Amino acid sequence: AAAQTHLSIRRNFLEEAYEACEALDCDDAAMLREELGDVLLQVLFHADIEADRGRMTIDNIADAECRKLIFRHPFLFGGKNASWDELKQQEKGQKTTGEAMQGVARSLPATWRAEKIQKKAAKTGFCWKSAGQALDKLAEEAQELREAVQDDTNIDEELGDLLFAAVRVASTLDKDPEQALHSACEKFIKRFTAMEQSILASGRTLEELSREELLASWDAQKRNGR
């Protein structure tokens, strides 16, 4: 592991974690066993890098995790009743909501990060509480993006605001925005594949059709419930 660095194998860690999640989604025990092993191997790689630096070992990591679990779950280990979030903030030295927001990992998928930040804001009362309010905000942000596109200015900022507002809509509906987007991707792939197969069966290719013909074929698949 000495030839590697945390950054050089960072992508491997992410890929293995996502593959483990894929195994969970598939409810495939054999696949899950393999992928969890791969994740564990990545943990050991990173621990070995730190051991080479003399900063920590896998035993230190396991001990710290046990201590953290005991601290954050006093109702299980000490008979006390306390808020998990409050204990986490106390442990990390976070005194304000802003500090807690800054503590949300930047490496999270953006929809999850936005959701976590919004939930922390919601605990202070700063939020759109109903789906209707959140949808109104989404419409407002959509209009601001439209204006930004017309003016060719601040497009990235307004697009980000629109996506952030969409995450809040999901939260008010108690839905996982990341899962909702994954489902939309799967639906798009399924419908596009059906459209492509239909066009190929007619002896033509997608490239031969006009945009209007492609959209008409897409709408036909949509009406068929695909």
What are these regions (language model features)?
Residues 2-35, 41-159, 163-226:
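Flexible "arm" and connector segments at domain edges
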